[in-house]
Design a protein with these regions (language model features):
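N-terminal "mature-domain start" segment
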Residues: 2-8, 17-19, 23, 35, ...
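Solvent-exposed alpha-helical segments and adjacent loops
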Residues: 1-14, 19, 65-130
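Signature of long, low-cysteine stretches enriched in small and polar/charged residues
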Residues: 39, 44-96, 193-249, 260-262, ...
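Sec/Tat-exported extracytoplasmic proteins
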Residues: 5, 25-36, 112-119, 154, ...
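Secretory pathway targeting signatures of secreted, lumenal, and periplasmic proteins
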Residues: 2-4, 10-16, 23, 147-197, ...
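Acidic/His-rich structured neighborhood in mature extracellular/periplasmic domains
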Residues: 111, 115-172, 176-177
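Intrinsically disordered, low-complexity, charge-biased terminal/linker regions in eukaryotic proteins
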Residues: 1-55
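Surface-exposed amphipathic alpha-helical segments
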Residues: 99-119, 144, 150, 250-281
Length: 281
C-alpha cells in the first residue's frame, strides 16, 4: 500500500454543504500570538475522493440524508486508500443539525489532531538526537525523543534548556522539577541583562488534563514574554507527578519565530512531549 501524503494539518473535505465542516475545522487554535486555523482545509467539489486525493493523509466525507441518518454520526477508518491515513465519515439528517452538533462537539477535530501528532511522533523515531536524549536521561531519569536539530543545551539546578538556536524559528524544550513556571524561567532564561527574563502571560494560559504514555498529564498552553524586551511566543507544558523519582516534573516546549506562522512549528516540537516515559519502561 502506498504511503499517504499531504502537508501537516492539511485536510480534504467532501460533501460539505454550506461549509459547515470548513468553519469547524478552520476555527482558530487557542493560545497563539496571532490567529491561525486548526487545519488547512480544502473543500472538494466531488462527493468522494478520486485520483491523487485518495493518497491524502486526512480525508473527511460528509453525507446529508434524512432517510439514512436520524442523528449526526461520526465514524472513521484507517489506511483505507493509503498507509498512515484516516478517513472520517460524517453523516447527518440535515445541514442545520450538523451545524448544531459541530458547535458542541470536538470529536472530528480531536481525531484529526491525534492523527497529525501521531505522524509527528513517528517522524521523531527516525530523526532524533541521542546525545541530548542521554543528557535528559542522566539528569531526570526519563526517556524522550529530542528533535535532531536541537543541538544546543544549557544545564541548571534541576533544569535543562535544549534549543535549535535558529535565528528565524527557534524551537526549545525545557525540563524542570516544578510547576512554578515563572520562578524557574526567571532564574534560568534571561535576556541581555538580569533585568530581562522570561515570564508568562497568565491571562493567555489554558489548562486541561490529558493522558499520555498511560499517565495523567496537566497540559498548559499559553504565551510567554520576555520582560524588558520585545520578545514572545507560544508555549505548551506537560506536568507529570510521581515519575522517575520526581514528585513533579514539567516538560515544556516554546517557540520564538517573529513574523512567521507558528502552529506547525509548535505542534512539531510538542510531539516530543508526547514521547516522555520513565527510563527503562
Amino acid at each position: 500500500m502506498t504511503k499517504s501524503g499531504g502537508r501537516p494539518f492539511e485536510v480534504v473535505v467532501y460533501g460539505d454543504e454550506d461549509s459547515v465542516l470548513y468553519h469547524s475545522l478552520t476555527s482558530p487554535i487557542p493560545a497563539l500570538p496571532q490567529p491561525e486555523p486548526s487545519f488547512d482545509v480544502t473543500i472538494s467539489k466531488n462527493s468522494q475522493p478520486k485520483g491523487a486525493d485518495l493518497l491524502m493523509r486526512n480525508i473527511v466525507i460528509v453525507t446529508i440524508n434524512p432517510k439514512t441518518f436520524s442523528r449526526t454520526s461520526v465514524k472513521y477508518e484507517r489506511d483505507v486508500y493509503a498507509k498512515n491515513q484516516i478517513v472520517i465519515y460524517v453523516g447527518s439528517p440535515s445541514v442545520s443539525q450538523l451545524r448544531k452538533d459541530m458547535t458542541t462537539s470536538s470529536v472530528i477535530t480531536d481525531l484529526l489532531t491525534r492523527q497529525e501528532m501521531g505522524a509527528m511522533v513517528a517522524t521523531l523515531k527516525d530523526k532524533h538526537n541521542p546525545k541530548m536524549e542521554e543528557t535528559v536521561r542522566r539528569m531526570f531519569g526519563i526517556e524522550m525523543r529530542i528533535p535532531s536539530d536541537m543541538k544546543s543545551c544549557k544545564e541548571g539546578k534541576d533544569f535543562v534548556w535544549i534549543s535549535n538556536n535558529s535565528p528565524t524559528s527557534m524551537t526549545n524544550i525545557c525540563i524542570y522539577t516544578s510547576e512554578n513556571r515563572d520562578s524557574v524561567m526567571r532564574k534560568n532564561i534571561k535576556g541581555e541583562t538580569d533585568n530581562m527574563y522570561m515570564t508568562t502571560n497568565k491571562e493567555s494560559v489554558i489548562s486541561s488534563i490529558a493522558k499520555t504514555q498511560d499517565r495523567q498529564v496537566t497540559v498548559r498552553r499559553g504565551l510567554w514574554e520576555m520582560k524588558g524586551d520585545a520578545m514572545g511566543g507560544p508555549f505548551v507544558s506537560h506536568t507529570l507527578h510521581d515519575i522517575a523519582g520526581h514528585k513533579t516534573l514539567t516538560i515544556e516546549c516554546f517557540v520564538y519565530a517573529p513574523g512567521t506562522k507558528k502552529r506547525n512549528t509548535l505542534m512539531r516540537t510538542e510531539a516530543s512531549l508526547m514521547t516522555v516515559k520513565a527510563a527503562g519502561r
